[in-house]
UniProtKB/Swiss-Prot annotation:
The keyword Ribosomal protein applies. One of its GO terms (biological process) is negative regulation of translation. Transmembrane segments: none annotated. The keyword Ribosomal protein applies. This is Large ribosomal subunit protein uL13. GO terms for cellular component: cytosolic large ribosomal subunit. Keywords: Ribonucleoprotein, Ribosomal protein. GO terms for molecular function: mRNA binding; structural constituent of ribosome. It comes from the Bacteria. Part of the 50S ribosomal subunit. The lineage of its organism: Bacteria, Pseudomonadati, Pseudomonadota, Alphaproteobacteria, Hyphomicrobiales. InterPro entries: Ribosomal_uL13, Ribosomal_uL13_bac-type, Ribosomal_uL13_sf. Disulfide bonds: none annotated. It comes from Brucella ovis (strain ATCC 25840 / 63/290 / NCTC 10512).
Length: 154
């Protein structure tokens, strides 16, 4: 019996909707990264985009445990000498694009490369409760019910 290898033409993708309100960032990001990669399926193949399409709503209401809300720093470089910049998680969550905290957490849990970039395109993150994917009839996934630690104390 040969080892099973999924072909790209045989992939069946589902749409999954997750409400991130009150959920812990890292635990949610880990679960979503596995869904995007397709590791929750028995047909997982490392070199094939086998994951689901994931929609996350209320990304602005996620919870960071400990002192990460005030102390965690996100760094980037402008490309100019001395151009290192930083923002705290609090500044980002209270800023214009609060969904970026969750996007970055998920992005950093997915392997870098062409396949990882393609898998990240299957992720849609929205700060508010509205999304434009009703036509896809997404299946609701209750992450808070999977483990009591998934829900933050905020």
């Amino acid at each position: 019996m040969a080892t099973f290898s999924q072909k790209p033409a045989e992939v069946v993708k589902k749409w999954v909707l997750i409400d991130a309100e009150g959920l812990v960032v890292g635990r949610l990001a880990s679960l979503v990264a596995n869904r995007l990669r397709g590791k929750h399926k028995a047909t997982f193949t490392p070199h094939v985009d086998d994951g689901d399409n994931v929609i996350i709503i209320n990304a602005d209401k996620v919870v960071l445990t400990g002192k990460k809300y005030t102390d965690k720093k996100y760094y980037w470089h402008t490309g100019h000498p001395g151009g290192i910049k930083e923002r705290t998680a609090r500044q980002i969550l209270e800023g214009r694009f609060p969904e970026r905290v969750l996007e970055k957490a998920i992005e950093r849990m997915i392997p870098r490369g062409p396949l990882g970039r393609r898998q990240m395109k299957n992720l849609r993150v929205y700060a508010g409760p509205n999304h434009q994917h009703e036509a896809q009839q997404p299946e609701v996934l209750d992450v808070a019910a999977l483990n009591r630690k998934n829900k933050g104390n905020a």
